[in-house]
């Protein structure tokens, strides 16, 4: 297939027959590069990063390290905030165990001991109840 450009018309000759095209905005595949790029455009532009592959790798690695650092910072902030809040599932079992130990140490006294305390008391049983700020 041979293509001839004559001003605004393009003529394609195929096996002795000719087809005329007058639309200047439509370009045929021969005017474009192998993968759809125009002749003026570099067909290898999408692969130019490989020219400086070490710089590209370093940049990507820095971005990954930065993202990892940010993730660790956020996790540390969340952990610190978690410690400041009361979470029953985490905090209650320890507190309940401590209270259970304290309750086990208590004993119920019999009524004779309370009578002994009252008989040894120096307080006046007929005195009025003390109320702070009230003068009698």
Swiss-Prot record:
It comes from the Eukaryota. It comes from Mus musculus (Mouse). The keyword Ubl conjugation applies. Pfam families: PAM2 (PF07145). Inhibits translation of capped and polyadenylated mRNAs by displacing PABPC1 from the poly(A) tail. GO terms for molecular function: mRNA regulatory element binding translation repressor activity; poly(A) binding. The lineage of its organism: Eukaryota, Metazoa, Chordata, Craniata, Vertebrata. Residues 15-25 have a biased composition (Polar residues). GO terms for biological process: negative regulation of translation; negative regulation of translational initiation. Ubiquitinated in vitro. Belongs to the PAIP2 family. Expressed at very high levels in pancreas, at high levels in testis and at moderately high levels in brain, heart and lung (at protein level). This is Polyadenylate-binding protein-interacting protein 2B.
């Amino acid at each position: 297939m041979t293509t001839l450009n004559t001003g605004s018309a393009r003529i394609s000759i195929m096996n002795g027959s000719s087809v005329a095209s007058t639309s200047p905005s439509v370009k045929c595949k021969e005017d474009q590069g192998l993968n759809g790029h125009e002749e003026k455009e570099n067909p290898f532009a999408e692969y130019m990063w490989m020219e400086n592959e070490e710089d590209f790798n370093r940049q990507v690695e820095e971005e990954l390290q930065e993202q990892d650092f940010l993730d660790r910072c956020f996790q540390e902030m969340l952990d610190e905030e978690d410690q400041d809040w009361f979470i029953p599932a985490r905090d209650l079992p320890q507190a309940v165990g401590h209270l259970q130990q304290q309750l086990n140490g208590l004993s119920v006294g019999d009524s004779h001991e309370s009578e002994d305390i009252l008989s040894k008391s120096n307080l006046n049983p007929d005195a009025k109840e003390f109320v702070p700020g009230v003068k009698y």
